Amino acid sequence: MEISWGRALWRNFLGQSPDWYKLALIIFLILNPLIFIISPFVAGWLLVAEFIFTLAMALKCYPLLPGGLLAIEAVFIGMTSAEHVREEVAANLEVLLLLMFMVAGIYFMKQLLLFIFTRLLLSIRSKMLLSLSFCMAAAFLSAFLDALTVVAVVISVAVGFYGIYHRVASSRTEDTDLQDDSHIDKHYKVVLEQFRGFLRSLMMHAGVGTALGGVMTMVGEPQNLIIAKAAGWHFGDFFLRMSPVTVPVLICGLLTCLLVEKLRCFGYGETLPEKVREVLQQFDDQSRHQRTRQDKIRLIVQAIIGVWLVTALALHLAEVGLIGLSVIILATSLTGVTDEHAIGKAFTESLPFTALLTVFFSVVAVIIDQQLFSPIIHFVLQASEHAQLSLFYIFNGLLSSISDNVFVGTIYINEAKAAMESGAITLKQYELLAVAINTGTNLPSVATPNGQAAFLFLLTSALAPLIRLSYGRMVWMALPYTLVLTLVGLLCVEFTLAPVTEWFMQMGWIATL
């Protein structure tokens, strides 16, 4: 019997999302106009809370859909205007170009990145050294590339290796269902469980590595570019400005990586089983023998393009998004990717998030029009200049750990810039606040998958169920990093940021514009 029209509409609305989630969104959409009539300020804060809720529930439904519906309604009832949204999008065009072109550009360098991580995994036998290498490699790559892409590459390596061993363990050459362990005998299951623990720890080290490297440069995370543009900094300026906080945090983060592996705590310490290593080594040897000259040339070309990418970013030869576009053109031209559909696949990863970021800017427009953050900023600016840095860092950190850090960083840097332009703070203090905002947005956000897009990407990937990586387990494994990164970052903002920045100025390395 066919279902009713009403039931069909309900099932189509937000698809597979739970009924309670659909109902909650409908209640939000009904309440917002009513509360807006009574108090626009309260309605504005309610919208922000609802939007954060959609981000926190990203596993139930991709936030673009519910967040987009809330944003459309906000414009429709007058919380902001379509013109203001357009202005916000125009002001942040560089960030949208970064997401569209840089992420797509790196997609065409995946073969090189896969080669690097495969060599690391099979060449280094010490688990502590391997974990450190993965963390450092992810940090270095994320300083120049998009963190999502770096994590995507590591996921590809892990899924590939898991599939190779799973086929051997199940005695099936065509093992299509990697989640089906029914054909694996007891001995192999024990080894497989150990292998899962090994892969979980490597994935978490790599994920945290993207946060450690991503905070250091203006292209490491999308919000970094927003903050850099607001402060008028280029690549080198941004790196030096952040270094009083980010360099000590990087060192402590890497030490934490070694410590958790040494102590075998928080789910770390599992080594690669020797039987798995033998299987993977055989497969890698076979792959290397089958690699043609054409394949080798592709790797060499991608390495050269990587050098161009780093050089162009460091010398600021063009806007970041345009450099990404040049990578797409060079990589496709020189590696023989000419089919439109093959090129189009590169954009599937970044465009949903680009659309979501545009929705962010709609909510930012509401925040500006309704002056929602004015009381918080007013409270922070009442404190001494020294205390302002820690307060901005803490407020950013609290919100970033449960919400998307692009959203949080955009809000706070806009408010700080408005305070500077109104004369409430000096330009010098504003530049220090920009560092506190950037580090506060990036470092504590490793606490949950909601804060780090790379973590959320890992949690929703095909790999997560294979290696038994749940939301709770990810939060638990991230806990030592969360504590160390957050506390070291706070101490650096409190004690080293101002004096080291002053010393950089005296040396002539940086200057207040």
From Swiss-Prot:
Residue stretches spanning the membrane: 23-43, 52-72, 97-117, 144-164, 202-222, 238-258, 303-323, 348-368, 391-411, 447-467, 475-495
Reactions catalysed according to its record: 2 Na(+)(in) + 3 H(+)(out) = 2 Na(+)(out) + 3 H(+)(in)
Subcellular localization(s) per the UniProt record: Cell inner membrane
Keywords attached to this entry: Antiport, Cell inner membrane, Cell membrane, Ion transport, Membrane, Sodium, Sodium transport, Transmembrane, Transmembrane helix, Transport
Record-level Gene Ontology MF annotations: sodium:proton antiporter activity
Pfam entry (one): NhaB
Record's bilayer topology term: Multi-pass membrane protein
GO cellular component: plasma membrane
Keyword NAD: no
Family according to the record: Belongs to the NhaB Na(+)/H(+) (TC 2.A.34) antiporter family.
Function, in words: Na(+)/H(+) antiporter that extrudes sodium in exchange for external protons.
HAMAP family, alphabetized: NhaB (MF_01599)
UniProt name for this protein: Na(+)/H(+) antiporter NhaB
Native source organism of the sequence: Escherichia coli (strain SMS-3-5 / SECEC)
Taxonomic lineage from the root: Bacteria, Pseudomonadati, Pseudomonadota, Gammaproteobacteria, Enterobacterales
